[in-house]
Amino acid sequence: MKKSEMKGYRTHHCNELNLALVGHKAKLCGWVHSKRDHGGLLFIDLRDREGITQVVFHPEKDPPLFAKAKQLKNEFVVKVEGKVVERPAGTKNASIPTGEIELEAESLEILNPSQPLPFNLDEDIENEELRLSFRFLDLRRKKILNCLKVRHLVSSVVREYLSREGFLEVETPILSKSTPEGARDFLVPSRLSPGKFYALPQAPQQYKQLLMVAGIDKYFQIARCFRDEDLRSDRQPEFTQIDLEASFVEVEDIMKWVEEMIQLIFLKVLGIELSLPFVRLTYSEALDNYGSDKPDLRIEWQIQDVGTVFKNTQFKLFRDVIEKGGVIKALNAKGRAPMVNSSALEELVGIATSMGAKGLAHIRVENQEWKSPIVKFFSSEERKELERLLRMEPSDLVLFSAGPREQACLILGKIRLHLAEMTQGIPGNQWKFAWITDFPLFEYSPLEQKWNSVHHPFTRPHPEDLTKLNEGKYDAIRALAYDIVLNGVELGGGSLRIYEKELQEKVFSILGIGKERQELLFGHLLKAFQYGAPPHGGIALGLDRFVMLLTGSESLREVIAFPKNRHGVDLLTQSPSEVDYQQLKELNIQLSFPSIKIEP
């Protein structure tokens, strides 16, 4: 390498040196990953973001340099210059790209020392609170770093694909308007407008619809979103979604773009070519066959309706359910009977009873014999038809749920998933996508005694069901909405939108939002609909959740650089935190919590 090329901190990253560069000079910068003293020779593994290079120090060639190298400790930041040499026979390491060479050190500069680390970067650390408190160190771990690289690659592919398809990336406001009909907003007080507040956006929903009214035609954004809600393992108060919207589209147009984008992501990130199109299931089909609106299609078992088998049954439990208009559903867990002992079965019964069932009837097939307290109530014709319908064989475990359709399906859906997890019935390295369509537009809340949107109030009713709006048959109206599901996890959801002022006002009124409140909260959108709003629709995919699945991570916190913990706290910066009294005074805010003391 020419001398002029040796200026600056480094000439290469720690994954780039190889046999082709033997004899060349190189400069590397990074962190001391490990240090080893082997019979006089001193070795360090030097690590940067891209990889590791072994550096060797010879005591006889440069004693002062060797003495300086002996001072090194793990995670010291150093700059090393030297000559690339081939490793001696028997010392090569095929597990890393630089494993055939080493850098023979000629100079060493310690750029910054390091305190001893609170945990070993090479180990899995169970104490997540400790990791998050030292997140800047946790991010040095290869596993977490890889998650961020995958996240970057996914974002890059999204931008590449959507730009190629004619979408414009447009940023929408972070300081927005509060519309408290959904989840709780994060509020931001305005200093210049005392007593008034911005809200951090839960989604760019209204802005992207306004962009369609503006004639943008195709919009996308990798959008930051905020929701002040109770946290679960798969939730964060701030999250990122791949957001897109387009004008003059049908449902299939949106699905095609999303499928092709995901196909490209899988090819570039995992080297896997997905088959298109993805499976399509209506909401009713998903509920009836899988007991869930986000079915895991890796599990082969399907729920089946066996009501016809027992239409004339003498088994009182089933007969009473049928007479009340209920259903009899069955799940045949193929080959699982030997894997489910009495305690495991009690666990399944507990799931059913927790969801409102009185119990969980079952049949074990042992050889050619059915083991169950209920089979004595079945006629020979019922047994024969049940065996045919469920394809019952030795070692099968059949579970029954009887009651109202939705309840019976949901119970077996949860048991289906739990039983598959319990008996290792979910194949690894499979990617099963599905679109779920034709959701109900509304759902009734007995607690609130009002109708709510299943998705959001801007979702377009199915054209075949529009007359039911005026007839008051709200529970029979389908939505032009669609969710995309991967391996039982909802990746995202979207819909075609309402773009007529009168129809939007009608939906608002069904949801209990009066005219005055409509104008207060959504007047800007209703006004826009009077100026030539085009038909439009879109979707939002959870970027964090998608990357979590792609990397096999257990939590969203693994794929976010600086996440909050389960209590919504950033343990690194200790936020949220108290603020200065003067800041509150400027915002005309007075706290009313006696447990919080802020000194002037």
From Swiss-Prot:
Annotated ATP binding sites: 227-229, 236, 490, 542-545
> Which positions does UniProt annotate for L-aspartate binding?
181, 227, 455, 497
Q: At what residues does the UniProt record annotate the site feature described as Important for tRNA non-discrimination?
A: 38, 90
- Catalysed reactions listed for this entry: tRNA(Asx) + L-aspartate + ATP = L-aspartyl-tRNA(Asx) + AMP + diphosphate
One of the GO BP terms on file: aspartyl-tRNA aminoacylation
State the residue spans of region: Aspartate.
Answer: 205-208
UniProt keyword list: Aminoacyl-tRNA synthetase, ATP-binding, Cytoplasm, Ligase, Nucleotide-binding, Protein biosynthesis
- Write down the SUPFAM superfamilies for this protein, in alphabetical order: Class II aaRS and biotin synthetases, GAD domain-like, Nucleic acid-binding proteins
Per the entry, what this protein does is: Aspartyl-tRNA synthetase with relaxed tRNA specificity since it is able to aspartylate not only its cognate tRNA(Asp) but also tRNA(Asn). Reaction proceeds in two steps: L-aspartate is first activated by ATP to form Asp-AMP and then transferred to the acceptor end of tRNA(Asp/Asn).
Query: Known HAMAP family for this protein?
Result: Asp_tRNA_synth_type1
What does the subunit comment say? Homodimer.
Full protein name:
Aspartate--tRNA(Asp/Asn) ligase
Q: Which source organism does the UniProt entry give?
A: Methylacidiphilum infernorum (isolate V4) (Methylokorus infernorum (strain V4))
Question: What is this protein's gene name?
Answer: aspS
